Amino acid sequence: MKVLMLTDSFLPHAGGSREYYYNLYRHLAEFEETRVTIATKKVPGWEEFDRKASSDSFGIVRWLRPLSTWRLQELPKGLGPFLHAAWHVAKDNPAILHAGDLYPQGVSALILKKMTYLPYLAYCHGEEITLTDRYKYQPHMRNRVYQGADAVIANAEFARQSLLRIGIPESRIVKITPGVDLERFSPRPAREELVDKWNLKGKKVVLTVARLIPRKGHDLVLRAIARLTRELPDAVYLIVGRGPEEQRLQKLAAELGIMDSVRFAGYVPGELLPDCYNLCDVFAMPNREEANGDIEGFGMVFLEANATGKPVIGGRSGGTADAIIEGKTGFRVDASQLDELTERLRMLLTDTNLRRQLGNEGRDRVQREFQWRDRARKLHDVSMEICKARSREKRTAILANPE
């Protein structure tokens, strides 16, 4: 089975969906007689990443290449990726297309299906629906892409319910939540050089690993820390990541008078992220839905933190109900209620036994339920069934019209 995956959401560009696709397709390609090609765009750092990924079992092709005397990037948005996809369909003759993004990849898959009868499955992380609901014409094209798909992969229950709401048949929705690399994310002693670098010795550390954008809720944690510092003077907030909100968050920390209790770590290489989780006492990302409909589709960071034995706090919006079991692996809070977040942080920072209990349960749950190989098997089986069904349809058509 040849699989051609079309997506703009792929490493080395940072983000949960990029990690989701990388791990899912890395394991999918390990199945016998399954060949996977990722068709994606060039982003900063792609050459080094592709060299390192050359040992993986899938291929990566990047668009924005010269074509005759002009370049694909000079074409209107959407046409370049479509031509790139069409060229690889003609060249490689895949059995199925996977569309990782609604636009332009999902639209490209829909058009190619009409042109070539090639089946496709599409992905939904939830925000594809919440972000387009507010527009006049986008919901129509969105619905055509999902209705035309042979299957739609929902990454969480929130996404599955959103698909049902817009009329996608339940029989065509397959829920495949993210997994965790348990060899990479595991409990280990704190790395002393990082403890010294960020002056964390003897501190109670609250950690967020995320892009610095509004829906992640960094500002809420800052305000909660400001409330707690008098009672818990050793509490420190470690922020790992970069983003457009960095200056605003630094300004807020200064206004709250807590700069000494905040560490802006900036970009941290992926190989050091497990060590960052192991530095903290509590992982907190009180995500919220933005006015434009932007939401947290799942929250892979909650699983990564649990995998290292840490309790987590997340927001109640989006798909976090799949990532956090309330009172078992952590807590979900109403991000509009600062009192609730503050109290949950106080509870965890002052109760060692509770932290250990939730962290251990989180680790056990991740080991039981969130193996990447299991998710890849589900994707493999869905894809194979679609390909077999299409083959049966073709044989039936040939028998019905022998001439």
Question: Residue locations for each model-derived region?
Answer:
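N-terminal subdomain of nucleotide-sugar transferases
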Residues: 1-50, 401-403
